[in-house]
């Protein structure tokens, strides 16, 4: 009979940052008897989870993709944002053959170039200077028909930052060529990642058919009208920007038409660099066997992805992935360990794809468990999300005695934190606390151990103290790392997210591969 395994668990609280001040701090406000007890009884430390510690520009907040990638890699990896910034600075961006091919296609067909993506300075899914660089490039190449399809943020920026962003973008367009904003749409629609295809279809139809819930004479008015309807940036319904129809210098009775829609032979550059929320609308454009919704129109276009969104798609990629060798999952597999990755829908890609170095592949003896996220409009309506279901399932898996290593993500503090609803975020923290209490009790019975940490901050800063408005973005605050288990380990040193994987390997008695430059957090006597 095979001896039952005593698992090592890596438990990631998405959005669990540390901030001393209690005002606007859902983590400090919540009743968390289990976490309080763990922090009192167990060794713990702080980890840097933002900026240069995770391969981002100095001072930039972390995010889930970057956090999980860094945790799994065991090293600091220059993130796509940083890679693209460097290419702009050294000029390689403007010589990128994929961009140049898209421009050549437009010139050869006398067609249009469409630049679509999140028009945000947040730096999580996209970065406004990248769009600016594209506009400078097309100005240099003297393209006449250039259109922007602006997705609005409201999560990685304040809920009403888009109006100012759009004004600045409009001014930049006037200074650098003649690009026009053709549509605006909240990311809730254009960047859904949970196969809520009705949302994606609204954005897709706006881009391809010029059909949307609303129209406006310009992008600034589109955003202002949305605010008047009670919509914040994330939830702005797709809106077509229209222009008056002039025939023989006379304005016709029909009065207006869309500024532009995506047509056959056009080029499209999707300038988001983060994959998870770029996939669905990309699939709608490029997949022959797409079945998410009925496409009334499917234009044949030259479609460029800024980075690799889906390795199964044969599309041009401006910045292809850099392969990471010997990430945590690979090392565990090579040593014959059986591992489990478990999360709900919102963070499933993070404990699989991103933790595995940005690759879809599943390693030998790597089991995966997806718990569906609740089908609701916003997670403040159900702050516990699917945490209780995840906990029930992971306890069952622990008790099975099958696994050596279990990686679990609780999405609550991040996803509810993004809503900006303080009371809901407090409930989210309390739900996770109940879950961790149950899990560590079972681990204790089985002789298991756990590292409990986070990928970035969020719920600890729910109010912008300068404006008094809800704070919906991530933070650059440090995160905690708690060790639960073997009493021989007395202390952890402060470190970075890249130190988590080397710590796990030391706990398992596995040599750290040379590619991992992070260092174990365990303090030796």
UniProtKB/Swiss-Prot annotation:
Keywords assigned by UniProt, alphabetized: Glycolysis, Isomerase, Manganese, Metal-binding
Active site (catalytic residues): 64
Cofactor annotation comment: Binds 2 manganese ions per subunit.
Binding site for substrate: 125, 155-156, 187, 193, 274-277, 347
GO cellular component: cytoplasm
Reactions this protein catalyses: (2R)-2-phosphoglycerate = (2R)-3-phosphoglycerate
Cofactor dependency: Mn(2+)
Function of the protein: Catalyzes the interconversion of 2-phosphoglycerate and 3-phosphoglycerate.
GO annotation terms (biological process): glucose catabolic process; glycolytic process
Enzyme's top EC category: isomerase
Binding annotation for Mn(2+) 1: 414, 418, 474
Record-stated family: Belongs to the BPG-independent phosphoglycerate mutase family.
NCBIfam families the UniProt entry points to: pgm_bpd_ind
Entry-linked PANTHER family: 2,3-BISPHOSPHOGLYCERATE-INDEPENDENT PHOSPHOGLYCERATE MUTASE
UniProt organism field: Methanosarcina barkeri (strain Fusaro / DSM 804)
Residues involved in Mn(2+) 2 binding: 14, 64, 455-456
EC number(s) reported in the record: 5.4.2.12
Name under which the protein is recorded: 2,3-bisphosphoglycerate-independent phosphoglycerate mutase 2
GO MF terms, alphabetically ordered: manganese ion binding; phosphoglycerate mutase activity
Pathway, per record: Carbohydrate degradation; glycolysis; pyruvate from D-glyceraldehyde 3-phosphate: step 3/5
UniProt-listed Pfam families: iPGM_N, Metalloenzyme
């Amino acid at each position: 009979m095979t001896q039952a395994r005593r698992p090592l668990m890596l438990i990631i609280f998405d959005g669990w940052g540390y901030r001393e001040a209690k005002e606007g701090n859902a983590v400090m406000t919540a009743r968390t008897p289990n976490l309080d007890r763990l922090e009192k009884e167990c060794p713990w430390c702080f980890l840097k989870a933002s900026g240069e510690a995770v391969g981002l520009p100095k001072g930039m907040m972390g995010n889930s993709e970057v956090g999980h990638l860094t945790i799994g890699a065991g090293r600091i990896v220059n993130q796509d944002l940083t890679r693209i910034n460097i290419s702009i600075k050294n000029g390689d961006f403007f010589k990128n053959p994929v961009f140049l091919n898209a421009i050549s296609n437009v010139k050869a067909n006398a067609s249009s170039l469409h630049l679509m993506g999140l028009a945000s300075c947040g730096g999580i899914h996209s970065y406004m200077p990248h769009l600016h660089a594209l506009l400078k490039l097309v100005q240099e190449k003297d393209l006449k028909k250039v259109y922007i399809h602006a997705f609005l943020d409201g999560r990685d920026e304040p809920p009403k930052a888009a109006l100012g962003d759009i004004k600045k973008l409009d001014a930049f367009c006037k200074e650098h060529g003649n690009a026009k904003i053709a549509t605006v749409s909240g990311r809730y629609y254009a960047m859904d990642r949970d196969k809520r295809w009705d949302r994606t279809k609204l954005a897709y139809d706006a881009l391809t058919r010029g059909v949307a819930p609303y129209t406006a004479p310009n992008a600034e008015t589109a955003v202002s009208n949305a605010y008047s309807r009670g919509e914040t940036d994330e939830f702005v319904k797709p809106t077509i920007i229209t222009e008056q129809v002039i025939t023989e210098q006379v304005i016709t009775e029909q009065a207006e038409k869309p500024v532009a829609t995506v047509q056959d032979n056009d080029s499209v550059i999707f300038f988001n660099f983060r994959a998870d929320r770029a996939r669905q609308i990309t699939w709608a454009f490029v997949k022959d066997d797409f079945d998410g919704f009925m496409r009334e129109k499917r234009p044949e276009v030259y479609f460029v992805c800024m980075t690799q969104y889906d390795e199964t798609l044969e599309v041009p990629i401006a910045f292809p992935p850099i392969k990471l060798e010997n990430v945590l999952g690979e090392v565990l597999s090579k040593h014959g360990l059986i591992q489990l990755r478990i999360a709900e829908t919102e963070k499933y890609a993070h404990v699989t794809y991103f933790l595995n170095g940005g690759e879809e592949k599943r390693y030998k003896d790597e089991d995966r468990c997806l718990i569906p996220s609740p089908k609701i409009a916003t997670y403040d309506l159900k702050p516990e999300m699917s945490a209780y279901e995840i906990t029930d399932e992971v306890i069952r898996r622990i008790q099975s005695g099958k696994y050596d290593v279990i990686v679990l993500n609780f999405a609550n503090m991040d996803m509810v934190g993004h809503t900006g609803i303080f009371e809901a975020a407090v409930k989210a923290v309390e739900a996770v606390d109940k879950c961790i209490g149950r899990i560590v009790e079972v681990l204790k019975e089985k002789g298991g151990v756990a590292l409990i940490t986070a990928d970035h901050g969020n719920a600890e800063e729910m109010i912008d103290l300068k404006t008094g408005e809800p704070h919906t973005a991530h933070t650059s605050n440090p995160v905690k790392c708690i060790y639960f288990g073997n009493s021989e380990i007395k202390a952890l040193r402060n470190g970075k997210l890249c130190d988590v994987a080397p710590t796990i390997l030391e706990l398992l008695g596995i040599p750290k591969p040379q590619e991992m430059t992070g260092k174990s957090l365990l303090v030796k006597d």
